[in-house]
Amino acid sequence: MPQNEYIERWQKQHGKRFDHDERKRKRIAREGHDGSKKAQNYRGLRAKLYAEKRRKEKIQMKKTIRAHEERNVKTSEPAEPSTEALPQYLLDRSNEKNAKALSSAIKQKRNEKAARFSVPLPKVKGISEEEMFSVVKTGKKTAKKSWKRMITKPTFVGPGFTRRPVKYERFIRPMGLRYKKANVTHPELSVTVQLPIISVKKNPQNPLYTQLGVLTKGTIIEVNVSELGLVTAGGKVVWGRYAQITNNPENDGCLNAVLLV
């Protein structure tokens, strides 16, 4: 048995207290009071974080309650035209239908819409700042300062990029780690083409890395797909499309990406 499961081990050997279930029920029932007390007494950043956590819990709870209510709601739909003549007092009546089918159809449509924007790698491993940046010391020998950082991962900078003066440049992007092209695979056509990168749309690690144009696994980039000859329904040539990086460029020395279609 794993070392951290000593409570379960003890319970298997000796059993539980006779009032274990009752105590557990009461503890769960008291959680609301404890949460309220914390919300009233926390201050500063701790209070903000706790309030945000409580807000998300309440949203989830409301969704669950609404889902339970939806199951038994009945809605009326117009009856099919009858062949027999109905009396006046029966004309406003119609067949009742359970709303669950309608609700599930709406949810299905929402899921389909969300699937259009799904990516090949929904989750990626986090990268620490120590791994991303190396400290560069600067200044006189007697009073060196460590405010500069060198990016150790591949980056993309636009064609019109110019460095800031050395004295004011906080983040250094080495020339050897700058990429301009990516090997993009089209999932439906099953072809791989080397396409120029237009921009970095989103780095999942940190908004700062997006701003700096850092290229890590899972990053969404915009590539120029005019060479593929893709056209819209209206007949216009598609210029830029998003793609997601699927490899670790710092290890492989190249950028591999999958086009989001």
From Swiss-Prot:
This is Ribosome biogenesis protein NSA2. One of its GO terms (biological process) is maturation of LSU-rRNA from tricistronic rRNA transcript (SSU-rRNA, 5.8S rRNA, LSU-rRNA). The keyword rRNA processing applies. Residues 1-22, 49-74 have a biased composition (Basic and acidic residues). It comes from the Eukaryota. Involved in the biogenesis of the 60S ribosomal subunit. May play a part in the quality control of pre-60S particles. Keywords: Nucleus, Ribonucleoprotein, Ribosome biogenesis, rRNA processing. The keyword rRNA processing applies. Its main location: nucleus. The lineage of its organism: Eukaryota, Fungi, Dikarya, Ascomycota, Pezizomycotina. InterPro entries: NSA2_fam, Ribosomal_Se8/biogenesis_NSA2. Coiled coil: none annotated. Pfam families: Ribosomal_S8e. GO terms for cellular component: nucleolus; preribosome, large subunit precursor. It comes from Phaeosphaeria nodorum (strain SN15 / ATCC MYA-4574 / FGSC 10173) (Glume blotch fungus). The gene is NSA2. Belongs to the eukaryotic ribosomal protein eS8 family. Ribosome biogenesis protein NSA2 subfamily.
